[in-house]
A protein has these predicted regions:
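N-terminal flexible/basic segments that precede or flank functional cores
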Residues: 2-71, 122, 126-139
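Extended interfacial segments that mediate partner engagement and assembly in macromolecular machines
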Residues: 51-115
């Protein structure tokens, strides 16, 4: 944890190194993730994370939130796209998503909304619908 300071840059307090649960904010929703290596200021309570730990923590929190909401995980979204033989860009055109949306869903850096999740499930569960939409959208 080289990048975690020993002195808090906010208040000057001592930063304690800990391994334990942390709350991670995902769009205003707090997700508790256990066993996280981090630093916490003994005076003001500010938390500090190594950048690599923060990235893993964020992805883990997204996966946990997807599971809690009953959303498809990134691995299933990728499997669906690949089963249709589409690139990420072509899949985005098919479903009307913005650039780089699918890669973010697939690597669990963001979660899809319920409407998008429902569309993904329809494409997965009804191949005829997927084929018809592909013919109309992608030519």
């Amino acid at each position: 944890m080289v990048s975690i300071p020993s002195i808090c840059p906010l208040c000057g307090g001592e930063v304690e190194r800990l391994v334990g649960p942390v709350e991670w904010d995902l769009r205003g929703e707090l997700v508790v993730v256990d066993g996280v290596e981090h630093g916490m200021c003994a005076v003001c309570g500010e938390s500090f994370f190594d950048p690599e730990v923060a990235d893993r923590l964020h992805r883990f929190a997204v996966v946990k939130l997807k599971r809690a909401r009953g959303l498809l995980p990134g691995s299933e979204i990728k499997a669906l796209r690949e089963s249709l033989g589409l690139s990420q860009a072509a899949f985005e055109r098919l479903i009307g998503a913005g650039p780089k949306t699918v890669v973010r869903w697939e690597n669990d850096s963001v979660f899809q909304n319920k409407t998008a999740d429902t569309l993904l499930r329809v494409l997965r569960d009804y191949p005829v619908v997927a084929a018809d939409l592909m013919a109309k959208t992608l030519g």
